[in-house]
């Protein structure tokens, strides 16, 4: 039965929570989604800084106002138990890590995903819920050194259980299925091998994991708490509780027991007897018959001890006081109720008969630990602290009956503030929940009609401070009914302005959660919101509410609010001008054996990764945006099917069409550029930024491939296929008995990019004494665009390179994304870059053939952008852009491109071993990419170039090479001044979007005040 089954793995360590404390101050009115200042509703239109200053004055921020909701553990396995009562500390797993991670984010393609903790009711002390997306154990150090033994997916929320005296328990299951992976190293651990055998044979249906947190205190990082952590991993069987501890419940000082033959297993993971009590014994409650000794100091939480026959009596734990008096410490609650989904968010119904927003709650009843039929009474107890603006709810005399947050029902017809259900012989039952008014409440599920809260006031019955000490051992459900926002669906979509969006959606979170403004960007900045529409929607899409990365992490964004947000973001994406196109009548070489050759090859790898990223970006930008594509459809130039093919659905899902696929590949190439640089820096070289000239680049690289900036089409896609071609498709050429040509020593060319990386990989292993950085100080760590297959096996991977193992893994990682089947031979279901371009080529050819069969006019999937555009001229392989407007925009783009690279150079020059993902400089570089370069590029491809039949495009030309500025104060002023000049230049060009100017102003101000870090 759950954690009582064998084998068990015990672990311990610490847990860190970054739960935001601002909303817990009692100044948040959940019925209106508003905040309170001096007893009145604070207007959402007023600056958030004004409200933050008020909270400072009244002490309303708490200790973690900037908490971001992250939940993390640092734990290791302390013992395994394969036979009852036999604790083994010699198993291979002992000392190995236990990890909880968040869900994989398909849009950002992230590793190192954090689990979450959030309050269902932020005004309550009882509803802090954990959400975990991935669980694993078995790594030793980094997973590419000694990997995981097991990883698996986790679903749903993990409500708090057994809240008592600063202790709390969370439980979750990892069900068997496609999200579960046992690695080969499981065979080396008898305990892991047995767990695997049970699951794969069907004797068990997955794993169950308990986390017990206690003794909270300040954490080393700001806005966080650190807890003592103990936990247990055991087999799980379908039909057993997912989030509730199984067994016979004894309360208070909660523990559960499982009597089997001559022994009893006790779940003491959260048990702590009263001070001064010793000699704990498990006895029968009525006849006082001794059953077993209860160890009070076991380090593992779940223990098995010899036991006498228990019979059919209830159980109790008896102890002895310092004065020698025997007292009952805990007594069995003979009828218990389990509700796995005990953290509930309800959308407010549209009207009295709206059943679409109802929630069905599954219940299971137990009698002395075994499923059995029972009659259960369900009542509700609203939280007065959730209604600070309601004088009736907060009155000292208010009773639980004065306010109904939900209506309850068994049959779907008779709704009431309470209900009674009868479970079947298996203990199973269900009831329905419907929102009655916005706010927060708690449901009590009890086998007795009378409750210990009868006759108490609302505040006393809710017992936020646990004065009564009763709720911890009772079955309850935390319910949040979201505000009634259905009126937002009636707002005409063309009337959705940013001011309206901020007031009705963003303001609440800006007022209460500062981590967005401090760690990401402020939702009050219109230009930042308009810069990241797809990112914002993917995080806020209601379909992702069950994912850990969902925003807001509080999960209280209503459906109408989400649709209002989507309407605004789509409107911004449609605000484009489409040009009118009018017809006109007029490996295989000498192995790398020296450091010099290896460094040269790595620098070529860096140059190639940057070059392929830029040409993929150019091809992606040549495709009209979804908004522009809609205009082309309305003009009859595109069909709706062609719009879907090229641009996807406009951001509602992750389907970005061919354009989205190209951008996704380009993002991964940017990571390749960084990770190959990480290898280069690990061998003692500086961060390398090549100066690429697409007019001459093909004469300078080690691979005989064609690199150029040109529009997306069948020709360019075929070039991309050739670049990403796997090594197996490039072989030696033979003719009869003629010998295979052998390259000369000075010939450093390769047949493919794959051959180059293969040679680098061998060189890393061949050349001695390469790595000069200290272990753990590789730097350059980041976790974006790393794919779910990497996250499944290496959720801790963040690109660092500091030794041979991590360098080889980095090269394999780059090759895996390009070719596939490098890190694993298994089919991950993910496309390599090669596969992506083959698919795109097939789609384009299919569309061309369809057009020919239906005698449709020839279709172009892209704007007629110039091939290798330039503002400088020089050579027939580049097209000189002569239009003054286009040239002005190209110069602005190129200077922004320089600044993006300068910021990277400045980071690696000044802080080479610092976190890249936390770097102000790198984050500013990303802001330049997304907030300046992308909108300028999307504009440039629509502007006439001055050459017949061609539009302009971003040329990625550098007038000077970025170089590290050693003095931090000089660097700060220089960077700020350059951004200021760029902002002024952008301001004088009427075509430049306002958000670009604002982003440049923001960056100039940021470096003028903060400086690079």
From Swiss-Prot:
Which Gene3D superfamilies does the record match to this protein?
1.20.1260.10
Q: Which InterPro entries match?
A: Ferritin-like, VioB/RebD_dom
Tell me the cofactors it needs. Answer: heme
Enzyme Commission number(s)? 1.21.98.2, 1.11.1.6
What's the domain of life for this entry? Bacteria
**One of this protein's Pfam families, by short name?**
Ferritin-like
Which keywords does this chain's UniProt record carry? Answer: Heme, Iron, Metal-binding, Oxidoreductase
Q: Which residues form the signal peptide?
A: none
Q: Recorded GO terms, molecular function? A: catalase activity; heme binding; metal ion binding; oxidoreductase activity, acting on X-H and Y-H to form an X-Y bond, with oxygen as acceptor
Q: Which reaction does it catalyse?
A: 2 3-(7-chloroindol-3-yl)-2-iminopropanoate + H2O2 = dichlorochromopyrrolate + NH4(+) + 2 H2O + H(+); 2 2-iminio-3-(indol-3-yl)propanoate + H2O2 = chromopyrrolate + NH4(+) + 2 H2O + H(+); 2 H2O2 = O2 + 2 H2O
Q: How does it assemble?
A: Homodimer.
Role, per record: Involved in the biosynthesis of the indolocarbazole antitumor agent rebeccamycin. Catalyzes the hydrogen peroxide-dependent dimerization of two L-tryptophan-derived molecules (imine form of indole 3-pyruvate (IPA)), to form dichlorochromopyrrolic acid (CPA), the precursor for the six-ring bisindolopyrrolocarbazole scaffold of the rebeccamycin. The hydrogen peroxide is provided together with iminoindolpropanoate by RebO.
- Annotated family: Belongs to the RebD family.
Name the chain's protein.
Dichlorochromopyrrolate synthase
Q: Which organism is it from?
A: Lentzea aerocolonigenes
Record lineage: Bacteria, Bacillati, Actinomycetota, Actinomycetes, Pseudonocardiales
Gene behind the chain: rebD
């Amino acid at each position: 039965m759950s954690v009582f089954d064998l084998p068990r793995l015990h672990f311990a360590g610490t847990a860190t929570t970054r739960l935001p404390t601002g909303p817990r101050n009692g100044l948040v009115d959940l019925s209106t989604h508003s905040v309170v200042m001096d007893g009145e509703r604070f207007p959402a239109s007023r600056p958030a800084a004004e409200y933050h200053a008020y909270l400072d004055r009244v002490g309303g921020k708490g200790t973690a106002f900037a908490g971001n909701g992250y939940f993390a553990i640092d734990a290791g396995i302390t013992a395994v138990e394969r036979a009852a009562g036999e604790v083994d500390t010699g198993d291979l797993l002992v000392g190995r890590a236990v990890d909880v991670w968040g869900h994989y984010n398909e849009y950002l393609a992230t590793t190192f995903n954090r689990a979450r903790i959030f309050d269902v009711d932020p005004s309550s002390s009882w509803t802090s819920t954990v959400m975990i997306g991935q669980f694993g154990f078995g790594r030793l150090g980094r997973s590419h050194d000694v990997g995981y033994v097991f990883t698996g997916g986790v679903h749903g929320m993990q409500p708090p259980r057994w809240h008592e005296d600063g202790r709390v328990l969370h439980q979750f299951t990892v069900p068997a299925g496609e999200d579960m992976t046992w690695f080969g190293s499981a065979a080396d651990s008898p305990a892991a091998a047995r767990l695997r055998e049970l699951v794969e044979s069907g004797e068990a249906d997955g794993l169950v994991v308990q986390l017990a947190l206690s003794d909270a205190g300040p954490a080393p990082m700001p806005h966080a708490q650190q807890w003592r952590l103990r936990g247990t991993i055991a087999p799980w069987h379908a039909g057993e509780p997912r989030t509730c501890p199984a067994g016979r419940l004894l309360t208070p000082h909660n523990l559960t027991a499982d009597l089997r033959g001559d022994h009893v297993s006790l779940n003491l993971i959260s048990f702590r007897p009263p001070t001064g009590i010793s000699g704990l014994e498990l006895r029968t409650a009525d006849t006082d018959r001794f059953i077993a000794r209860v160890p009070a100091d076991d380090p593992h939480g779940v223990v098995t001890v010899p036991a006498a026959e228990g019979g059919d009596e209830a159980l109790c734990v008896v102890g002895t006081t310092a004065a020698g008096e025997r007292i009952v410490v805990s007594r069995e609650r003979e009828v218990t109720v389990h509700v796995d989904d005990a953290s509930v968010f309800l959308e407010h119904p549209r009207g009295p008969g709206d059943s679409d927003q109802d929630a069905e709650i599954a219940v299971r009843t137990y009698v002395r630990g075994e499923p059995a039929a029972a009659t259960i009474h369900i009542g509700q107890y609203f939280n007065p602290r959730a209604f600070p603006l309601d004088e009736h709810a907060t009155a000292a005399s208010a009773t639980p009956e004065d306010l109904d947050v939900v209506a309850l029902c068994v049959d779907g017809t008779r709704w009431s503030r309470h209900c009674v259900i009868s479970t079947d012989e298996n203990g199973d039952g269900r009831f329905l929940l419907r929102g009655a008014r916005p706010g927060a409440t708690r449901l009590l599920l009890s086998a007795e009609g009378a409750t210990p809260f009868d006759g108490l006031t609302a505040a006393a019955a809710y017992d936020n401070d646990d004065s009564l000490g009763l709720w911890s051992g009772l079955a309850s459900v935390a319910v949040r009914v979201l505000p009634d926002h259905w009126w937002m669906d009636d707002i005409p979509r063309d009337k959705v302005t940013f001011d309206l969006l901020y007031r009705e959606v963003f303001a609440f979170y800006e007022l209460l959660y500062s981590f967005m403004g401090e760690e990401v960007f402020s939702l009050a900045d219109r230009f930042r919101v308009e810069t990241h529409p797809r990112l914002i929607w993917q995080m806020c899409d209601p379909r992702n509410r069950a994912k850990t990365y969902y925003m807001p992490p509080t999960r209280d964004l209503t459906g109408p609010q989400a649709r209002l947000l989507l309407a605004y973001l789509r409107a911004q994406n449609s605000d484009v001008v489409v040009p009118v196109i009018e017809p006109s009548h007029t490996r295989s070489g000498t192995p790398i054996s020296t450091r010099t050759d290896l460094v040269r090859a790595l620098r070529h790898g860096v140059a190639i990764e940057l070059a392929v990223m830029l040409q993929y970006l150019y091809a992606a930008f040549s495709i009209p945006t979804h908004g522009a594509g809609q205009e082309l459809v309305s003009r009859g130039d595109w069909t709706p099917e062609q719009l879907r093919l090229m641009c996807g659905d406009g951001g509602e899902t992750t389907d970005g069409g061919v354009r989205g696929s190209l951008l996704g590949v380009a993002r991964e190439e940017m990571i390749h550029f960084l990770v190959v640089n990480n290898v280069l820096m690990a061998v003692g070289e500086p961060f390398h930024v090549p100066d690429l000239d697409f007019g001459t680049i093909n004469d300078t690289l080690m691979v005989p491939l064609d690199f150029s900036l040109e529009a997306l089409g069948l020709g360019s896609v075929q070039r991309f296929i050739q670049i990403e071609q796997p090594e197996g498709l490039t072989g030696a050429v033979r003719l009869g008995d003629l010998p295979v040509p052998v390259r000369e020593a000075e010939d450093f060319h390769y047949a493919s990019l794959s051959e180059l990386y293969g040679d680098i990989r061998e060189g890393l292993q061949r050349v001695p004494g390469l790595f000069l950085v200290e272990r753990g100080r590789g730097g350059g760590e980041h976790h974006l665009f790393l794919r779910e297959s990497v996250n499944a096996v290496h959720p801790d991977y963040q690109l660092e390179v500091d030794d041979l193992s991590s360098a080889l893994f980095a090269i394999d990682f780059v090759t895996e994304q390009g070719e596939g089947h490098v890190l694993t031979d298994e089919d991950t279901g993910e496309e390599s870059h090669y596969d992506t371009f083959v698919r795109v080529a097939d789609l384009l050819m299919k569309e061309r053939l369809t057009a020919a069969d239906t005698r449709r006019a020839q279709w172009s999937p892209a704007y007629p952008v110039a091939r290798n555009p330039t503002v400088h001229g020089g050579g027939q392989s580049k097209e000189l852009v002569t239009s003054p407007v286009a040239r002005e925009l190209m110069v602005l783009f190129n200077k922004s491109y320089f600044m993006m690279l300068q910021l990277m150079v400045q980071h690696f020059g000044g802080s080479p071993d610092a976190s890249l993902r936390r770097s102000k400089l790198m984050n500013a570089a990303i802001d330049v990419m997304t907030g300046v370069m992308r909108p300028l590029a999307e504009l440039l491809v629509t502007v006439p170039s001055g050459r017949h039949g061609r539009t302009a495009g971003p040329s990625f030309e550098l007038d000077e090479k970025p170089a590290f500025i050693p003095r931090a104060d000089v660097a700060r002023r220089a960077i700020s001044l350059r951004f200021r000049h760029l902002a002024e230049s952008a301001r004088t060009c009427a075509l430049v979007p306002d958000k670009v100017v604002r982003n440049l102003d923001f960056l100039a101000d940021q470096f003028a005040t903060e400086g690079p870090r």
